[in-house]
């Protein structure tokens, strides 16, 4: 099954991601140094760094999708339990609902189908939920698995406990969704602001040829441009870390 804490590029996907990073890095370095060789060499490393950074983004997005889908999954389990199904059959019923809802295009449907198959091999629900919690690294799934395992061992009112847990997780995810919506708008603003410095340099080079020549092809100019590039990259990283903070 999927390890949600890691991501493996396909050769084609990696090539496309690397090329995207290479182009951005090469253009940026050429604008700052007016040197094709520096642009190409720097672009190669920029492509590698971008692929690593983008992998973290893909992992984060996949976990977010699973988290939102999990909300629907446990809601289905709760409904099935209220209808009188056993916990094992509740997963089967929830998987059927998920199949209709997502048409086979969701992570949680595959996870519930896997749980259903493993239950047929006499594995326990507790064991399978614990396994999913470890593979996903998602707090809500870990919380649900912990509550479920405790309730099963202590013989508590499973339906009431799961309903309460589902309600808490739903409320928490709604808050996360609202925050995510606000952060998305700020991320767009950040991307636009990140484009301003290189676009200004490009504009000056096109509209006023020779205006930036004192900053190119000499040691003093290279040091100044390197300092400006360092400040630009540092500001970009600080902004990215602030907006990428876990909610």
Regions found by a protein language model. Give the residues of each.
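Hydrophobic alpha-helical signal-anchor/transmembrane segments
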Residues: 1-75, 173-181, 185-247
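Hydrophobic residues in alpha-helical segments
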Residues: 32, 81, 119-120, 152, ...
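Glycine-centered flexibility sites
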Residues: 84, 122, 155-156, 221, ...
């Amino acid at each position: 099954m999927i390890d949600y804490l890691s991501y493996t590029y396909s050769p084609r996907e990696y090539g496309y991601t690397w090329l995207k990073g290479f182009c951005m890095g090469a253009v940026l370095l050429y604008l700052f140094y007016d040197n094709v060789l520096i642009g190409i060499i720097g672009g190669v490393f920029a492509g590698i760094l971008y692929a690593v950074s983008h992998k973290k983004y893909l992992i984060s997005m996949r976990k977010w999708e699973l988290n939102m889908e999990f909300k629907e999954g446990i809601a289905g389990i709760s409904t099935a339990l209220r209808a009188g199904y056993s916990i094992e059959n509740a997963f089967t019923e929830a998987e059927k609902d998920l199949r209709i809802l997502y048409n086979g295009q969701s992570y949680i449907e595959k996870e519930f189908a896997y749980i259903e198959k493993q239950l047929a091999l006499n594995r326990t629900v507790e064991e399978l939920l614990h396994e999913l919690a470890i593979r996903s690294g998602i707090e809500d799934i870990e919380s649900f698995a912990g509550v479920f395992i405790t309730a099963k061992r202590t013989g508590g009112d499973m339906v009431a406990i799961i309903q309460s847990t589902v309600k808490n997780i739903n409320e928490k995810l709604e808050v996360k969704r609202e925050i995510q919506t606000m952060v998305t708008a700020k991320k767009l603003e950040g991307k636009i602001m990140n484009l301003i410095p290189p676009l200004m340099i490009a504009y000056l080079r096109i509209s006023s040829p020779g205006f930036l020549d004192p900053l190119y092809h000499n040691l003093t100019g290279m040091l100044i441009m390197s300092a400006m590039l360092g400040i630009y990259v540092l500001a970009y990283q600080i902004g990215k870390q602030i907006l990428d903070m876990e909610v």
